[in-house]
């Protein structure tokens, strides 16, 4: 069996980039198999190293899949839209910067668009919430599940977004960007914000070399990339009210969501979170344990960060490395 190993730069103090590395692990495990991964901090620029079956760069395989993927939402048996447990109807404003108003976006049928709902008897929580329905990412007969925000187990769901946005809508924007409603003379509206799909077409070489470092103005996101974070200050200016996009990475955002499918960082107290990286190749199952800080008797580095509040949203901040006792 042929195996291919590739590496990309990673900022170990960025929770989003470490979670996105987990996303590459999870996606490559489904798409290719034979996955082992680790972090290499022997040089000034740390790297994330990924090995998978086959003769193609595993990062390229994952990014290409995501550039073509379509979304389906999952609902439990008996799900009723607008039920008592369905959605956040408090009417409070979500403070995510640059989020387009409802009705201002195009619903073109393109990669990344929601293609309907699938009823499943195996639902991760007791009732469905329209703002937190699990999704499938589907392309060429293969699919990835993204459902951490709907986790009804005792495990921390690590859902950071809030307000009247849905997981599927945010995922759609991270993949296919945001377009305005087309005018009468247009077949499609102008592009407000780029997603992974546009970046793959326009900056493929850069994405393959440094996928976490290609940033673009974004509106609402899952709040994993701390470069896109902001908190409200009483200074007479808000990127939300001004509708300015803040530069961050849709690649980090969607891959971090995928990376949380089977793993969680350790939220050891309210809004205080720990995670770890490991320096020896591990299969996905052990990598998930290592992320949460399990002592695997391997070279490891541990980090801690705070979740700040931005309106009703939680947002990541850059981490500090914990000193070893």
Task: Give the positions of each predicted feature.
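Domain-exit/linker segments immediately C-terminal to small folded modules
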Residues: 231, 235-325
């Amino acid at each position: 069996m042929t195996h291919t190993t590739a590496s990309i730069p990673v900022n170990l103090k960025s929770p989003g980039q470490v979670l996105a590395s987990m996303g590459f692990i999870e996606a490559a495990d489904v798409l290719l198999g034979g996955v082992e991964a680790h972090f290499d901090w022997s040089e000034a620029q740390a790297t994330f190293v990924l090995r998978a079956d086959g003769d193609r760069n595993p990062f390229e395989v994952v990014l290409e899949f995501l550039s073509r993927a379509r979304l389906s939402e999952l609902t439990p048996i008996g799900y009723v839209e607008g039920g008592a447990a369905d959605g956040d109807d408090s009417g409070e404003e979500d403070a995510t910067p640059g989020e387009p108003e409802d009705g201002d976006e195009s619903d073109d049928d393109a990669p990344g668009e929601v293609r309907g709902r699938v009823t499943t008897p195996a639902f991760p929580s007791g009732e469905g919430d329209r703002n937190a329905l699990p999704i499938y990412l589907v392309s060429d007969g293969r699919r990835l599940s993204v459902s951490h925000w709907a986790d009804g187990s005792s495990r921390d769901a690590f859902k950071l977004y809030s307000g009247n946005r849905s997981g599927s809508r945010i995922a759609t924007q991270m993949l296919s960007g945001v377009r305005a409603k087309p005018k009468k003379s247009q077949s499609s509206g102008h592009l407000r914000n780029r997603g992974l799909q546009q970046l793959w077409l326009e900056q493929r070489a850069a994405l393959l070399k440094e996928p976490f470092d290609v940033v673009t103005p974004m509106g609402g996101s899952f709040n994993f990339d701390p470069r896109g974070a902001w908190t409200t200050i009483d200074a007479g200016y808000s990127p939300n009210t001004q509708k300015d996009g803040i530069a961050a990475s849709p690649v980090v955002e969607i891959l971090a969501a995928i990376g949380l499918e089977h793993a969680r960082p350790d939220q050891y107290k309210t809004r205080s979170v720990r995670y770890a990286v490991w320096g020896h190749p591990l299969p996905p199952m052990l990598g998930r344990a290592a992320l949460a800080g399990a002592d695997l008797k391997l070279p490891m580095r541990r980090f801690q960060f705070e979740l700040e509040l931005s309106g009703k949203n939680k947002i990541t901040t850059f981490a500090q490395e914990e000193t070893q006792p």
